[in-house]
């Protein structure tokens, strides 16, 4: 029965064209009715686009629910909440808690039950307590489910609804065109009540891809989105979404149906709560990644995946040219959209986003240096038996323990320089918990799990961590203290709004990486300049074109610039934020920076 009212007609007009891009015409009207019945109780009073989703104040933490644990607490999520309130309450505004659901592998990304909290981590009350103080990012693992999930058990038994939720193919199907992020077999043989079948598994034999060509699968995931929003999510992260739609004879990545489904998700969130942001995780070459902004009608945010490998290479080489070339090629994020900046996460440092951006010699030197610093290289499979490097698995702190020349004594300064560059760029900054804590490679965990990614997934005992953080000479303490200070300074600068103007500067010194940020209201400028090398470097202030009628100060060190024709000496890996607008009261109490402490 068709529901004849204005609200339904408006809803239909907004989703029908998108559904027509995904499904056959025969199922569209029925699907619209089901969608409307599902969403009607949740439709908001206003669905006007919220252009104030973010500001310079937004900073996120990326963490597992059990990255820190304590025997004294009831659950790891309770410990996380305790840590956040003690150390980061004035520093971050949002928390991405990596998949906290029951799972069977891949540290949470093989979800058994989307609607439950893993009891080993805590419960929904723990999640909601954190979301009441911080903007919560929740993963929608949209491409696949665990082979131990109820849906897949139903598939094996041949019962509804799961029997229709997965992709069955012939074992001899030509899959040579399919883009692979892993080296495991794409097709997995499964014994079912109806005999042996082969199903699609992009990431691993335990992660079985769901079949979005079945509209009921779409409805299931929209129900999950609604549940996450009701549970406090302010960001919905679409994990591995680029692989969502499969079509034989294509690469099965970035297909038009995938883009249409993302647009549909955005449209639905817009109708439910315009303040919620959708973020896509597509670890692919830069041009492909940018396509997920669509025509400002797909993702609100995309990961800046090219930044980690390019910034790492720049600091290893001590030169800025590749960073500058990349930055000049990056378009400003569309209105209502933003880049999600990071240089470390639970995964490795992706290499595909650096394709075409580094020359062969530097690419080789990057991989060899990371191996020397204790890192591992993960591979992906091409057609046939060929493999190529996919990501570097290493703690970022250890990745920056030296340069291509070898280890040196500048690890902390180099690491802080990397983080300062990241938080200065156009976009919203996100810090992996093991970056804030300057955690070393965890080789013991790699040996325990047999997985290379475990090297950067250390689990801290809270009491042992506190002992380190209470020691002013501990590198963990020094890094956390200085990063918190820098983040708090950054959050007060309008020129660091995620959509504030960004312009690449070209000082004659290639060891310097410099860019200009200007606030949306055009009343604050910040010249963000960074020494990428292990030697002092001259910065000619005339290269920056500082307006002579303004007073200029470095927000990081407190240094004032009175002679605009002077030469300022940047110490190894030093960063400066030279601005014409600052809080004089805050300036008087400006803490000394790490270089002064040294």
Give the positions of each predicted feature.
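Active-site and adjacent substrate-binding regions of carbohydrate-active enzymes
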Residues: 2-598
């Amino acid at each position: 029965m068709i529901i004849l009212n204005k609200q339904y007609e408006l809803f239909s007009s907004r989703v029908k064209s998108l559904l027509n891009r995904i499904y056959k015409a025969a199922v569209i009207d029925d699907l619209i009715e089901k969608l409307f019945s599902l969403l009607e109780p949740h439709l908001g009073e206003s669905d006007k686009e919220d252009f104030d989703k973010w500001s310079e104040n937004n900073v996120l933490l990326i963490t597992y629910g059990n990255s820190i644990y304590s025997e004294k607490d009831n659950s790891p999520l309770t410990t996380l909440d305790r840590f956040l309130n003690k150390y980061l309450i004035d520093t971050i505004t949002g928390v991405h808690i990596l998949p906290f659901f029951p799972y069977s592998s891949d540290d949470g990304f093989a979800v058994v039950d989307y609607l439950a909290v893993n009891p080993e981590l805590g419960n929904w009350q723990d999640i909601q307590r954190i979301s009441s103080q911080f903007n919560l990012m929740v993963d929608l693992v949209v491409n696949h489910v665990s082979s131990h999930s109820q849906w897949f058990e139903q598939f094996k038994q041949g019962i509804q609804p799961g029997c229709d939720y997965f992709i069955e193919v012939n074992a001899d199907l030509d899959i040579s065109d399919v883009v692979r992020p892993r080296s495991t077999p794409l097709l997995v043989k499964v014994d079912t009540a109806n005999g042996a079948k082969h199903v699609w598994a992009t990431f691993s034999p335990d992660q079985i891809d769901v079949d979005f060509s079945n509209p009921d699968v779409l409805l299931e995931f929209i129900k999950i989105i609604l549940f996450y929003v009701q549970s406090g999510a302010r960001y919905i992260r679409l994990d591995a979404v680029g692989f969502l739609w499969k079509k034989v004879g294509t690469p099965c990545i970035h297909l038009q149906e995938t883009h249409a489904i993302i647009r549909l998700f955005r449209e639905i969130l817009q109708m439910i709560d315009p303040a919620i942001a959708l973020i896509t995780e597509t670890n692919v070459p830069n041009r492909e990644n940018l396509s997920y902004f669509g025509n400002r009608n797909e993702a609100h945010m995309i990961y800046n995946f090219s930044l980690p490998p390019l910034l790492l290479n720049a600091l290893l080489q001590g030169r800025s040219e590749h960073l500058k070339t990349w930055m000049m090629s990056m378009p400003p994020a569309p209105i209502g959209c933003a880049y999600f900046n990071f240089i470390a996460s639970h995964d490795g440092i992706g290499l595909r986003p650096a394709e075409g951006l580094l020359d062969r010699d530097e690419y080789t030197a990057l991989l060899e240096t990371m191996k020397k610093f204790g890192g591992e290289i993960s591979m992906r499979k091409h057609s046939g038996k060929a493999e190529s490097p996919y990501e570097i698995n290493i703690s970022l702190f250890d990745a920056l323990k030296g340069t291509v020349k070898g280890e040196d004594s500048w690890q902390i300064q180099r690491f802080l320089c990397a983080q300062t560059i990241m938080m200065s760029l156009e976009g919203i900054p996100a810090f992996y918990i093991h970056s804030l804590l300057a955690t070393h490679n965890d080789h013991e965990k790699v040996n325990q799990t047999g997985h290379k990614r475990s090297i950067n997934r250390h689990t801290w005992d809270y009491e042992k961590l506190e002992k380190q953080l209470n020691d002013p000479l501990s590198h963990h303490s020094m890094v956390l203290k200085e990063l918190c200070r820098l983040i708090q300074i950054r959050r007060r600068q309008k020129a660091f709004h995620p959509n504030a103007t960004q312009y690449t500067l070209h000082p004659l010194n290639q060891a310097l990486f410099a860019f200009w940020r200007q606030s949306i209201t055009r009343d604050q400028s910040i010249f963000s300049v960074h020494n990428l090398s292990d030697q002092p470097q001259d910065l000619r202030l005339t290269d920056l074109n500082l307006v002579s009628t303004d007073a200029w100060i470095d927000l990081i060190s407190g240094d004032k610039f009175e002679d605009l024709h002077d030469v300022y000496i940047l110490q190894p890996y030093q960063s400066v934020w030279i601005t014409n607008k600052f809080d004089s009261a805050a300036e008087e109490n400006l803490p000394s920076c790490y270089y002064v402490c040294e």
